[in-house]
Regions:
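Conserved catalytic or regulatory cores that recognize and/or transform ribose-phosphate-containing ligands
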Residues: 1-130
Length: 130
Protein backbone atom coordinates (compact mmCIF):
# COMPACT_ATOMS: atom_id res chain seq x y z
CA UNK A 1 0.00 0.00 0.00
CA UNK A 2 1.32 3.47 -0.89
CA UNK A 3 2.16 5.78 1.97
CA UNK A 4 0.22 9.02 2.34
CA UNK A 5 1.63 12.21 3.82
CA UNK A 6 -0.08 14.77 6.04
CA UNK A 7 1.56 18.14 6.53
CA UNK A 8 1.08 19.27 10.14
CA UNK A 9 0.75 23.06 9.86
CA UNK A 10 0.43 25.06 13.06
CA UNK A 11 2.03 27.57 15.42
CA UNK A 12 5.83 27.61 15.68
CA UNK A 13 7.20 31.14 16.09
CA UNK A 14 7.85 32.00 19.74
CA UNK A 15 6.41 28.64 20.84
CA UNK A 16 8.15 26.43 23.37
CA UNK A 17 9.18 22.95 22.30
CA UNK A 18 6.11 21.54 24.07
CA UNK A 19 3.68 24.02 22.50
CA UNK A 20 5.00 23.41 19.01
CA UNK A 21 5.46 19.64 19.18
CA UNK A 22 3.01 18.01 21.60
CA UNK A 23 0.00 18.18 19.29
CA UNK A 24 2.11 17.11 16.29
CA UNK A 25 3.48 14.12 18.22
CA UNK A 26 -0.06 13.18 19.29
CA UNK A 27 -1.31 13.26 15.70
CA UNK A 28 1.69 11.32 14.34
CA UNK A 29 1.35 8.66 17.04
CA UNK A 30 -2.32 8.12 16.20
CA UNK A 31 -2.09 7.85 12.42
CA UNK A 32 -2.51 4.61 10.49
CA UNK A 33 0.84 2.95 9.76
CA UNK A 34 0.62 3.95 6.07
CA UNK A 35 0.10 7.63 6.87
CA UNK A 36 3.12 9.77 7.71
CA UNK A 37 2.81 13.08 9.56
CA UNK A 38 5.31 15.66 8.28
CA UNK A 39 6.40 18.34 10.74
CA UNK A 40 7.85 21.63 9.53
CA UNK A 41 10.01 21.60 12.67
CA UNK A 42 12.26 18.75 11.60
CA UNK A 43 15.05 21.18 10.57
CA UNK A 44 14.42 24.12 12.88
CA UNK A 45 16.57 24.41 16.00
CA UNK A 46 15.44 25.96 19.27
CA UNK A 47 16.79 29.36 20.26
CA UNK A 48 16.83 29.44 24.03
CA UNK A 49 13.39 28.33 25.15
CA UNK A 50 11.46 29.04 21.93
CA UNK A 51 11.52 28.61 18.18
CA UNK A 52 12.45 31.73 16.28
CA UNK A 53 14.85 33.23 13.77
CA UNK A 54 18.40 31.95 13.92
CA UNK A 55 21.74 32.60 12.29
CA UNK A 56 22.15 29.44 10.20
CA UNK A 57 20.98 30.48 6.73
CA UNK A 58 20.72 26.86 5.60
CA UNK A 59 17.76 26.35 7.91
CA UNK A 60 16.68 29.65 9.42
CA UNK A 61 16.64 32.22 6.66
CA UNK A 62 13.17 33.27 5.54
CA UNK A 63 13.90 31.80 2.11
CA UNK A 64 15.01 28.43 3.50
CA UNK A 65 11.98 28.15 5.79
CA UNK A 66 9.58 29.17 3.02
CA UNK A 67 11.15 26.75 0.51
CA UNK A 68 10.97 23.81 2.92
CA UNK A 69 7.39 24.53 3.94
CA UNK A 70 6.32 25.06 0.31
CA UNK A 71 7.95 21.75 -0.68
CA UNK A 72 6.16 19.93 2.12
CA UNK A 73 2.81 21.53 1.27
CA UNK A 74 3.23 20.73 -2.41
CA UNK A 75 4.21 17.08 -1.86
CA UNK A 76 1.79 16.06 0.87
CA UNK A 77 -1.61 14.48 0.28
CA UNK A 78 -3.45 16.53 2.89
CA UNK A 79 -2.88 19.52 5.17
CA UNK A 80 -3.91 19.37 8.81
CA UNK A 81 -3.90 22.98 10.03
CA UNK A 82 -4.06 23.65 13.77
CA UNK A 83 -5.07 27.25 14.45
CA UNK A 84 -5.94 27.78 18.10
CA UNK A 85 -7.74 31.04 18.87
CA UNK A 86 -4.93 32.07 21.15
CA UNK A 87 -1.63 30.55 22.18
CA UNK A 88 0.22 32.50 24.86
CA UNK A 89 -1.64 35.67 23.88
CA UNK A 90 -0.50 35.31 20.26
CA UNK A 91 -2.88 34.97 17.40
CA UNK A 92 -3.04 33.89 14.67
CA UNK A 93 -0.23 31.75 13.29
CA UNK A 94 0.52 33.79 10.18
CA UNK A 95 2.69 31.08 8.65
CA UNK A 96 -0.13 28.56 8.98
CA UNK A 97 -2.55 30.96 7.29
CA UNK A 98 -0.11 31.27 4.38
CA UNK A 99 0.26 27.47 4.19
CA UNK A 100 -3.54 27.16 4.04
CA UNK A 101 -3.47 29.57 1.09
CA UNK A 102 -0.80 27.49 -0.63
CA UNK A 103 -2.86 24.34 -0.07
CA UNK A 104 -5.95 25.99 -1.55
CA UNK A 105 -3.92 27.04 -4.61
CA UNK A 106 -2.54 23.51 -4.95
CA UNK A 107 -6.05 22.04 -4.50
CA UNK A 108 -4.95 19.99 -1.50
CA UNK A 109 -7.58 18.84 0.98
CA UNK A 110 -7.37 20.74 4.27
CA UNK A 111 -8.57 19.77 7.71
CA UNK A 112 -8.78 22.73 10.08
CA UNK A 113 -8.62 22.20 13.84
CA UNK A 114 -9.53 25.33 15.78
CA UNK A 115 -11.47 26.70 18.72
CA UNK A 116 -11.83 30.07 16.97
CA UNK A 117 -15.50 30.58 16.09
CA UNK A 118 -14.71 33.59 13.92
CA UNK A 119 -12.30 31.55 11.85
CA UNK A 120 -14.77 28.70 11.28
CA UNK A 121 -17.38 31.20 10.09
CA UNK A 122 -15.07 33.20 7.82
CA UNK A 123 -16.41 32.89 4.24
CA UNK A 124 -13.02 32.09 2.68
CA UNK A 125 -12.40 29.32 5.22
CA UNK A 126 -15.94 27.94 4.83
CA UNK A 127 -15.58 27.88 1.05
CA UNK A 128 -12.15 26.24 0.92
CA UNK A 129 -11.46 24.16 4.02
CA UNK A 130 -12.95 20.77 4.85
Amino acid sequence: MNKKYIYLAGPIAQCSYKEANDWRDYVRNNLHENIIGISPLRCEPMHGETYGPGNDSRYNSPGAIAAKNWYDTEHCNLILAYLPRELNERRPSYGTVIEIGWAIGLRKPIILVTDDEYLTEHPLIKANVN
